[in-house]
């Protein structure tokens, strides 16, 4: 069930404490996938949340749940425009950037590392990951940390707590709509 996966993997985005989350969703049929995506988006669109399928293969969809207003803010942070320009992003417009990311994902098997920007990872950590080929990090949580370890550890704790609370509330009968904070 798509809603359960969103709660388990994207609670910090629903709670508006993180820009976006990414997860792989197994589906039975294309019709079921698109019906679930459309239903989810209808449910949370007015609260500023959007679910996008970035890539599909072998009945698995790579799903990105985000707050476009937060993504717009993140793409305008100092240094981000110059960083993503190296990967062919000609604009920091969120819709354009997301389409460019989708295109980059279609061109390769692995993840383009700039995806961290879309997931609210600090620019320094994204750059550190690339420069160090994923090695030599200070700590690992939701991402590999190369810069501000203390802040990252606090963020990881907030995200874990949020997910724990959201899973509990969802299991008690709260809907995704009820659990999604308005923008």
Regions found by a protein language model. Give the residues of each.
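A glycine-rich, hydrophobic loop/mini-helix early in the fold
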Residues: 37-95
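A structured, charge-rich N-terminal accessory region that forms the first stable segment of a protein
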Residues: 2-57
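Short acidic alpha-helix initiation/capping motifs at coil-to-helix transition points
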Residues: 75-77, 103-110, 133-134
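Hydrophobic/aromatic-rich, well-ordered segments within soluble, folded domains that form packed cores
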Residues: 112-137
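Short, surface-exposed beta-edge/turn micro-motifs
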Residues: 18-20, 59-61, 112-114
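Long, compositionally biased
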Residues: 142-183
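Internal catalytic-core helix/loop-beta-alpha segment
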Residues: 86-113
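Generic secondary-structure signature for well-ordered alpha-helical cores
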Residues: 45, 131, 135, 164-168
């Amino acid at each position: 069930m798509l809603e359960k996966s969103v709660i388990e993997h994207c609670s910090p985005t629903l709670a508006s404490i993180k820009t976006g989350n990414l997860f792989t969703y197994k589906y039975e049929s294309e019709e079921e996938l698109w019906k679930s995506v459309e239903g989810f988006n209808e449910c949370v669109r007015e609260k500023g949340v959007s679910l996008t399928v970035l890539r599909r293969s072998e009945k698995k969809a790579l799903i990105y749940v985000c707050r476009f207003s937060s993504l717009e803010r993140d793409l305008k942070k100092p240094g981000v425009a110059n960083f993503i320009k190296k990967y062919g992003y000609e604009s920091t417009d969120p819709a354009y950037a997301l389409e460019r990311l989708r295109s980059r994902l279609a061109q390769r098997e692995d993840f383009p590392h700039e995806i961290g920007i879309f997931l609210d990872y600090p620019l320094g950590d994204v750059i550190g990951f690339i420069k160090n080929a994923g090695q030599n990090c200070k700590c690992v949580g939701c991402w590999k940390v190369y810069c501000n370890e203390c802040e990252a550890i606090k963020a990881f704790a907030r995200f874990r707590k949020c997910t724990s609370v959201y899973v509990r509330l969802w299991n008690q009968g709260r809907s995704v709509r009820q659990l999604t904070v308005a923008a």
